[in-house]
Regions:
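Hydrophobic, regular-secondary-structure patches
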Residues: 1-132
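Short, solvent-exposed coil/turn linker segments
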Residues: 75-77, 182-183, 272
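Residue-level detector of conserved catalytic or cofactor/ligand-binding positions
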Residues: 267-275
Length: 275
């Protein structure tokens, strides 16, 4: 209501108007409403962000031809620590609790760049301009995590695998002590490979089923080899004058990459790979 009684707080009907008349979980209609001129949510929000349960399948290809999935990171599951057994679950939980949110090196940037760009200083390169470009985000101290080094291929991932195995088996962990600093040039231009997750399945005409080829080493190496390059084109660090910083340390890709992945999946459904 307009006006109001002095000393009293009135209620502005925002969410109730938004959802009234909408079918429960009718997300299509909800998004249509939010994007329409009828919506008043823009009066109270800086930006409207949409998130999807889609995570780009990103791989690192080493010089010897071997491939490693770095997003979503498969390190723990590949070592048998992601199974349902109580022992492995306990180990995984312990690792996750110790590392916090840092188990995910890659993440999506907010679609609205105005939300974060002013908070950061570009130390090298630039912000992503294409879906297949990403940026290395440093901490306010100008650091990256050791975990990120393994994902980027700047340290041998076998070293990480060994440490996790030792930890899981309650052995003394051989922790490396030879960490060094890295120049911006060593991070700039690092490349990863984008794989359409749907392409890890092929359709078997004989049995009429989709078969996973994720465990087929040769198939996956070829699939990754043919994947699009994802390239680090910039390095950013929180500006010392910023009162807050939205992004976390890691490798951030644009929202347009998520949209690209969804479109690729739809194409695969209409034109399946047959075997």
């Amino acid at each position: 209501t307009s006006g109001g009684v002095e000393g009293m707080v009135s209620v502005r009907q925002l969410i109730t108007k938004m959802v009234s008349g909408l079918t429960s979980n009718d997300l299509t209609s909800l998004k249509k409403y939010l994007d329409s001129d009828e919506s008043t949510i823009a009066d109270d929000a800086t930006s409207i962000e949409y998130s999807y349960s889609v995570s780009p399948q990103i791989y690192r290809q080493d010089p010897d031809g071997s491939v490693h999935q770095v997003n979503p990171d498969s390190t723990l599951s590949m070592l048998g620590l992601g199974s349902s057994g109580s022992g492995s679950t306990s180990v995984t939980s312990s690792l996750m609790n110790s590392m916090g949110s840092n188990t995910s090196v890659f993440y999506q940037l907010p679609a609205n760049s105005d939300l974060y760009k002013s908070q950061y200083e570009v130390k090298a390169g630039r912000w992503p301009e294409k879906p297949t470009e990403c940026v290395a985000v440093l901490s306010k101290y100008g650091t990256v995590t050791d975990y990120a080094l393994y994902s980027m291929g700047l340290r041998d991932s076998a070293e990480l695998d060994k440490m996790i195995q030792q930890f899981a088996q309650n052995q003394n962990v051989d922790v490396p002590s030879d960490f060094r600093t890295y120049s911006y040039d060593e991070l700039m231009g690092l490349k990863f490979k984008l794989v359409n997750s749907a392409d890890t399945y092929v359709y078997d005409d004989t049995y009429g089923i989709w078969k996973s080829k994720a465990d087929d080493k040769d198939y996956m190496q070829q699939l990754v080899e043919n994947g699009e390059d994802i390239t680090i084109v910039g390095i950013v660090q929180p500006d010392y004058t910023a009162s807050a910083s939205m992004l976390t340390s890691g490798i951030a890709y644009p929202a347009s990459l998520t949209e690209k992945v969804m479109k690729l999946s739809l194409i695969h459904i209409s034109e399946p790979t047959r075997h």
